[in-house]
Amino acid sequence: YATLLPAEVGYLHVDTEAVIAIAQDGEQLAKLREMRDGFEFFDKPYDASQVKLQHIIVMNAEGLEPADDWESLADLEARGSEQLEATADERQRRANDQQRDDTATYTYTSGTTGPPKGVVQTSGNMLSMLESAEKCGVINQDMKAGGLFLFLPLAHSFGRLIELSGPYFNTPIVIAGIPT
């Protein structure tokens, strides 16, 4: 969530050992920079060596001073476009190597009774969710043809279902622009 404090962001990064972060804007970039130097969360100190973050991508970099610790989404897209053909075989190999029991994502509890607890969701879990949504009619032909409207945060399991439905069912998704 955009409202998370730097220590909360840091905790999630340490817990998942994430090496790449995508920040919406300068405000979120500042949180990543702050937690990178270490933080305290639920009275437990975390030092910089525990933060594995190596690369930050900023989606809306307008007004930000260039720096070595982040890259704009536009620059990443340009760099990626230049390498599409050269990396096609490697990307296909990686896609083919994916197994249903591979980790796909983490979903966290709210943390109301202590530090948030991460739930590992596998590729198989996500695929089963999509297959079941279609089978029981949660995602039907009309929705596939007309598109889906996503208003839930991507930290929410149903929000993730809608997010993944776009590429899985080859259907458009409209994402609400209201911060959550």
Question: What positions do the PLM features span?
Answer:
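Conserved pre-ATP/AMP-binding loop-to-beta segment of ANL
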Residues: 78-108, 115, 140-147
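Hydrophobic/aromatic ligand-binding patch that stacks against planar heteroaromatic rings
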Residues: 12, 108, 164-166
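Conserved AMP-binding/adenylation subdomain of ANL enzymes
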Residues: 127-150, 154-180
